[in-house]
């Protein structure tokens, strides 16, 4: 049912306040320039090791199962981007020459790697591991490596794959109950908390270094290459952060819009997580600035703006007319000027690259964004709590996921053609809808309590509680169940679009959801960035890996 905005009673016009804590990082990345003396030496060493690893991948003497294990390690160590062509060829060969005479570890690994690569292989391959009663065979509980491999594979499931649902429960139960000798306890506990499918590649690489190093069969040149590469890329990212910090300081939002979260480095975590590879330097720059700009917009709508100011601001953005800025209050004027300048920067860079079409889609995305935000502002102003379905239909936009994807594509050069943008804006778009809804629910489950304390539109939690007259815990249970199913839908849609969209585009879509899963795993670590996210960023940007 449509919301009767005008008929509903309205709140008194009082500005809310959130009292966000100040920046953790300040101008750290400007004042602490990295020592790049070792980078040239690291690059020379890495170049030699890279060729050695390449020879391992294409070796004719290694069995397919051995190559798959090697590829899995390469991907987990975060260096697969150096060997995409070779990995693709091996995966295609393995897909074309299936060998059923393998153990649980190998079959589950093969299944996962093929699905990760976009091959829609059948989960029936796991039927052989069930007994006549339809249960997984009891002897499998003693095969810890096999259980781990099956556990990881189960997260590649799509709707209707009952055997993978059963595999997940079976492996969880027995992995949690099993006492293991080193290094498997670390690997097991990490897999239970961060399965490969949901882990952020750059973060997972750092955490896998110690696990792989404890493996008695680890390949030393491979491990050394991964560590060198991590440190080389870290120096590049440090430089990115100094540029972004300078841009942020020049905007002076901490003074002009002091009510907003000062989180520019935390905003850059999205970019570092999605585009850690060196080649995507412009994409990182665009996405870092986009998250920072949109975070302030979110606080304008959710924290500071009155409904009258927000209605006017929405109209100004929808018209995209800089001459209207003088109608806005000063804080909105400053913000709108920064938004216009950011878009002008994108337009200039994409036009130079022969992609002037990008800016049209970017503008359409921000207009959709303010329409979604003003809808929520009206709901809050009128004390209206929508049904979950009505909420989600708007929240997939207000989540910022669609605009972040759009702006990310602007920075991706040749991979994001006009056809890709046309696909993105085609409705219905189940892949975009699923990823956006998933991002929104992950956020809501962890952040809604703090938001409600300061005054905020009803989240998915409050909407579900009111609609179904249930407790908060019951709402959590149901929404977490929806999240599980949306991950399955996301897996299915990514499989469908493989071959239609370039792999970097699909990786971008997946990685933004993964970032949300990291940021909101236990709490809203973006808003409260003094804890886990600070440590992750220090790992990404400050602390080199001992080689």
UniProtKB/Swiss-Prot annotation:
EC number: 4.2.3.-
Cofactor(s) needed by this chain: Mg(2+)
Pfam families per record: Terpene_synth, Terpene_synth_C
A biological process from GO: diterpenoid biosynthetic process
Ligand binding (Mg(2+) 1): 298, 302
Span of the annotated motif DDXXD motif: 298-302
Protein's job: Probable sesquiterpene synthase.
More about this protein: Does not produce any detectable product when tested in vitro.
Record-stated family: Belongs to the terpene synthase family.
Protein name: Probable terpene synthase 3
Originating species: Ricinus communis (Castor bean)
